[in-house]
Amino acid sequence: MWFPPWIIFSLFHTCLSIDLTYHIEEERSPGTYVADIAADSKLLDNIKSAEQQMVTFSQLKRKVTQYFNVTKTGKLYTSQKLDAESLCTYNKECSRIIKIVVRKTKSFTKILKIKIVIKDINDHAPEFPEKQIILQFGEGDREGMKKSVPNAIDKDISYQNSFIEYKLKKSDDSFSLSVSKRADGISSLKIVLKDKLDREIKDKYNLEVIAKDGGSPSKQSVLNVVIVVEDENDNPPVFSKPLYNISIRTTHDKTKPILTLSVTDKDIGSNSKITFHFSPKTSSQAK
């Protein structure tokens, strides 16, 4: 198809520059008004009012046309709900370019290049991969021992809305939260032991890690961290009495017990299993 030189120049100029730029928030309902291209382009300013009705606006058929609709009078609307997360990538300007053909009667006048910036809204809260995790710390673990916990992900694409701040919901004397950034910008979370644990005093701790994004208003989620204290064999068996005094007759039946010992051990599992034997200092007669 042949075009006059002035049309070719106009097309070339259009490819190099943006004529109009508009902004609209994502998730607006289909049919949301965006702008009046006819008024903003000022193309009708030099046309007599009686002839302005002859000027029409239409959109060049491209893939992006499915998102927007332009009326003959130059009004721009959305044709469907726009989701920034599905249309664009993280921390990049989310925009689409449409080209509007302006005609007077049937003759070609100009092509306008319109840029529509889709603004990310804070419609996603940070999400942990799980609602709850279980960590194990031992009684023998020293101060500074760390255990990793999963980080949260925010699906919003703007830096502010996807920025996540972490903290423990309540301060704890035994544990703290360490947050550092990896080379890829992802946060690395660790639960840090602040003081030696004693399972016999407390065998379980419940912590809540809060992930809060930078949106306004902000959104947040909670990761429940259950910390189970593993037993260490740090308690000896204890007899109910430090000394047992008994008397037996010489005629006592050897098959019958002369004493029942009571022993307890504060440890659990195999650490609390008790066996009995005579001390090497016990005389053979007593045995």
Task: Give the positions of each predicted feature.
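Extracellular cadherin-type adhesion modules in metazoan precursor proteins
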Residues: 1-287
